[in-house]
Amino acid sequence: MNIKTLNGLTALVSLLVILPAIAGAETRELLLAAYSVPKEAYEKRIIPAFIRQWKQKTGETIQVRSSFAASGAQARAVVGGLEADIAALSLESDLQQLVKAGLVTYDWKQGAQKGIVTTSIVALGVRKGNPKSIQGWEDLTKPGVEVLYPSPKTSGGAMWDVITVYGAGLNQGKQKGLAGAAVDQHAADLVRRVQRNVKVMDKSGRESVTTFERGVGDVIVTYENELLPRIKQGR
């Protein structure tokens, strides 16, 4: 897998809130409800480090269970009754669902980082050797090029993907000397032309990457942090 980092990319954010503790628990156990992409980072690094730090700080041993799904689906699950103690989602609108449901009892934006715990950018992942010669966003619209990104109906990452394509279209329009509504029309047209080449729209960013690794598609639009570890592993 190769990576193409292009101009006109949109920053991605991971947003976190601490939900009210559930009374009456017999053991000190926390449930993390998070969007799917940072699964390995949480399970291999962040959660073990938190458990060690908490033990050193308080002397208390805790256990952390985790649930990973597309950001929008995860938000609906928590509102619907999933008893999460911590929610890490990829869109502010998903977190606001928890706020409206009365599940967040403090101003989650009040900290120095405004609730944002990680950032990344949108990038393009291509097959080894880049056989379709993908160099820019226009290449995603060419006949015969199969594109992958998840469904914006369920995936927060997919919304960032689409916004990034739109932003690239805005930049293109301005570079061509367009102005006003013509720039917006150019950007919307780029989104439509890319969408026509989308082969599969999975429920989450992680599922989309898995589909790409199974040999489906020529190029994937996803988080850069999803691509870099795979490139290092020669995948």
Model-derived regions, located:
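Bacterial N-terminal signal peptides
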Residues: 9-20
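Early extracytoplasmic/lumenal segment of secretory-pathway proteins
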Residues: 26-101, 109-111, 223
